[in-house]
A protein has these predicted regions:
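Active-site glycine- and acidic-residue-rich loops that bind
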Residues: 75-78, 104-112, 173-185, 208, ...
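Active-site glycine-rich loop that binds ribose-phosphate moieties when present
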Residues: 144-165, 180-183
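Active-site pocket-lining/capping segments in soluble small-molecule metabolic enzymes
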Residues: 17-19, 99, 112-137, 148, ...
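Short, well-ordered secondary-structure micro-motifs
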Residues: 108-109, 142-144, 183-184, 209-218, ...
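Conserved, mostly hydrophobic/aromatic
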Residues: 67, 158, 167, 200, ...
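Glycine- and other small-residue-rich loops at beta-strand/loop junctions that grip anionic moieties
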Residues: 17, 43, 72, 171-175, ...
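Active-site beta->alpha loop and helix N-cap motifs at the rims of alpha/beta catalytic domains
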Residues: 2-153, 272
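C-terminal helical cap(s) of enzyme catalytic domains, especially alpha/beta-barrels
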Residues: 273-284
């Protein structure tokens, strides 16, 4: 696989940070290209003040902040409207990732990203980019029976919404380690009529123990087996994981199938943003 194809596949990649991680980064330009899309994870319990402050820092440094809006921790429409207003007016934010969120039960009236969309507040605030979640390996949280029925129905609804909104939409997925399952999922949703572009989630370089912990927490079942198999190989146990194989396989497939619906790579820097930066430089 040529480095040129990998470079093209990684062009325009995005990263994700928490306010805590962002507070330790003095200058984002030391690690990522100017203009990079930076998602801000809104972990349950994080004050909105910290989220807005982080978004402002990212935008002020010449990057594009995209905060998470987890439906289950938003009490009501007034709170949602306040968050949107603060992001817009205090941090110049016009991007959002709309998700259900990881809270076990809703704080108030919202339980899904569809309800956030139905509020129409993002369109009224002229948000330019609205991204939604994708689940290449399904989601036990959404489909406890192990099927993809609810996930598929929600994605179909959001696809119809994408035709009505002025905002640009994309599907940002949970991370995976298995290229074949990602390719199969991406092709399946395209065949089902979903024409929203996909930004595929990729775990950045990290220790195997870290990957296993996050994989279990995020419920990426098929991928856990891949990491466990690697951990059983004593020659690789002490070596940090790098997403070389999955990036190479996806870049190869994209090169051979230009209409493939995966358009961008979204890195989860589980081992740190510097490790992602170093990996991209090496890969390209």
């Amino acid at each position: 696989m040529s480095s040129e194809a990998i470079k093209k596949f990684l062009d325009g990649f995005s990263v994700e940070v928490t306010p805590k991680a962002a507070s330790k980064i003095e200058n984002f330009e030391d690690y990522i290209p100017s203009g990079t899309l930076v998602y801000i994870a809104h972990i349950e319990g994080t004050p909105i003040d910290e989220m807005v402050e982080t978004a402002k820092k990212i935008n002020d440094q010449g990057f594009c902040a995209m905060p998470h809006f987890p439906a289950r921790i938003i009490k009501d429409k007034n709170v949602l409207e306040d968050w949107i207003s603060r992001y817009k007016n205090e941090a110049n934010v016009s991007n959002a990732l709309l998700i259900a969120g990881g809270a076990n039960k809703p704080y108030g009236e919202y339980d899904s990203s569809i309800q956030l969309i139905e509020s129409e507040l993002f369109d009224k605030a002229d948000f330019n980019n609205l991204h939604i979640a994708g689940h290449p390996e399904g989601s036990m949280d959404i489909d406890p029976d192990g099927s993809t029925t609810n996930v598929d129905q929600a994605l179909s609804w959001k696809n119809e919404f994408s035709k009505r909104t002025d905002a640009n939409m994309a599907i940002t997925t949970q991370f995976s380690f298995d290229a074949s399952s990602v390719i199969s999922w991406a092709n399946n949703i395209k065949e089902a009529g979903i024409d929203i572009p996909v930004h595929i989630g990729i775990a950045g370089p990290a220790k195997l123990q870290t990957l296993l912990r996050y994989s279990i927490e995020c419920g990426v079942g098929a991928s856990i087996k891949i990491i466990q198999k690697r951990a059983m190989d004593l020659t690789k146990l002490l070596l940090p994981y790098k997403p070389t194989n999955i990036i190479t396989e996806l870049a190869t497939y994209k090169s051979n199938n230009p209409s493939f619906n995966i358009e961008k790579v979204h890195f989860f820097p589980l081992g740190g943003i510097k490790q992602v930066s170093d990996f991209v430089k090496e890969a390209c």
